[in-house]
Amino acid sequence: MVKTCKNQQGIKNANRDAKRKLKRDCDLVAVLLTMEQMANNLGLVWSIKNHAKELYKKAEGSRVFRGRRRHSRASMVACLYLACQEEEFPRIVKEMQSVSGGAKEKNKHINKVIGVFKKHFQVGRNYGKTQALDLGERLCTNLLALTTMSSKL
């Protein structure tokens, strides 16, 4: 009789562990889809999207988020920002903040998470700062597209 109780307890624990793992996997999929949507809003290429997802999975696996809000938008934005830096497609934090929900995630939270990522993974260390020419070229291209669209209307 005692063995049966222990077996039942073991089954309950196994079910609980399976449910936790399933929930973790579902949460990860939801985060990756949110990151995909953020990247699409910024107009990023697929290589940057994939690199950002890999950074997030790496951070999730090494438990960088322990003690913090695990699935905060700041961590997603930090992954996108560092992926852009590493792929030499510079962005500024303000641009990234625009897709994160704006007022929800302040620059200080995003910068803090970027610092944590840089400390743990040594990413983004040997890359220069964002140059004004890169930003000007991208923003002028966007303005040109807007003026041609408005003239067609």
Regions found by a protein language model. Give the residues of each.
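Non-catalytic, interaction-prone regions of core transcription and DNA-replication machinery
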Residues: 1-153
